[in-house]
From Swiss-Prot:
Annotated keywords: Ribonucleoprotein, Ribosomal protein, RNA-binding, rRNA-binding
Function, in words: One of the primary rRNA binding proteins. Required for association of the 30S and 50S subunits to form the 70S ribosome, for tRNA binding and peptide bond formation. It has been suggested to have peptidyltransferase activity; this is somewhat controversial. Makes several contacts with the 16S rRNA in the 70S ribosome.
InterPro entries for this protein: NA-bd_OB-fold (IPR012340), Rib_uL2_dom2 (IPR014722), Ribosomal_uL2 (IPR002171), Ribosomal_uL2_bac/org-type (IPR005880), Ribosomal_uL2_C (IPR022669), Ribosomal_uL2_CS (IPR022671), Ribosomal_uL2_dom3 (IPR014726), Ribosomal_uL2_RNA-bd_dom (IPR022666)
Similarity-based family: Belongs to the universal ribosomal protein uL2 family.
Family matches, as SUPFAM superfamilies: Nucleic acid-binding proteins, Translation proteins SH3-like domain
Region (Disordered): 221-274
Protein name: Large ribosomal subunit protein uL2
Species annotation: Yersinia pestis
Length: 274
């Protein structure tokens, strides 16, 4: 893994910082594990914008990543590491002993030729997936399930991890990167180690066009709009003289957005204040 700063041969290259991984596969992805991915432009079935700042971008295929890791007792060999345009983490193509191939999230330190396994009898090493009742307290894990059999939902992006800090009967307590402490059923699965490609956060796109390649459109400030377009719009100069709100008048900056009170009992401690 190398961090490359581009030479300023043009204004668009001047600030570019790339993360280069020579171990990534340079050919095409494994076709049977690809799916068509169509663009929505942020519109719903009525043609109305439901998510702003989305549009354009390079064509992509969706890689079918195995988040469940439920092929127990069958060892697999890592064939290669690949780039995935749909996520910040890299993925690994693994070949199981019975001939099946699957994509998994590539944990830190995983390389071609390594062996991985899932199940209660899997060894305690990076890349193996076990129920959390079988993982030692203090271990660092990723791709953590929140319901048994549903597939990993927590800690899936580049460099992410969760720490198992306690085990109490049928529940384990996890410490998330945000500082939140949360209880999850001990039968939920997790993959040992942390997600690879942690250097992803160090990259610098360098120009607006690089965001457009990724399907991200510009974000216009409300205070730069007219009163008809945004509550912050209009006026002389840059002041808007009121509490910050969204384009629809809902208070922002500090307003609580969590509404799922049913699962509040599983949150032992709220995330840390910044």
């Amino acid at each position: 893994m190398a961090i490359v700063k581009c030479k300023p041969t043009s204004p668009g290259r001047r600030h570019v910082v790339k993360v280069v991984n020579p171990e990534l596969h340079k050919g095409k992805p494994y076709a049977p594990l690809l799916e068509k991915l169509s663009k929505s432009g942020g519109r719903n079935n009525n043609g109305r914008i439901t998510t702003r700042h989305i549009g354009g971008g390079h064509k992509q295929h969706y890689r079918l990543v195995d988040f469940k890791r439920n092929k127990d007792g069958i060892p697999a060999v890592v064939e290669r590491l690949e780039y995935d345009p749909n996520r910040s983490a890299n993925i690994a193509l693994v070949l199981y002993k019975d001939g099946e191939r699957r994509y998994i999230l590539a944990p830190k330190g995983l390389k071609a030729g390594d062996q991985i396994q899932s199940g209660v009898d899997a060894a305690i090493k990076a890349g193996n997936t076990l129920p959390m009742r079988n993982i030692p307290v203090g271990s660092t894990v990723h791709n953590v399930e929140m319901k048994p059999g549903k597939g990993g939902q927590l800690a899936r992006s580049a460099g992410a991890y969760v720490q198992i800090v306690a085990r109490d009967g049928s529940y384990v307590t996890l410490r998330l990167r945000s500082g939140e402490m949360r209880k999850v059923q001990a039968d939920c699965r997790a993959t040992l180690g942390e997600v690879g490609n942690a250097e992803h956060m160090l990259r610098v796109l360098g120009k607006a066009g690089a965001s457009r390649w990724r399907g991200i459109r510009p974000t216009v400030r409300g205070t730069a709009m007219n009163p008809v377009d945004h509550p912050h719009g209009g006026g002389e100069g840059r002041n808007f003289g009121k509490h910050p709100v969204t384009p629809w008048g809902v208070q922002t900056k500090g307003k609580k957005t969590r509404s799922n009170k049913r699962t509040d009992k599983f949150i032992v401690r709220r995330r840390s204040k910044k």
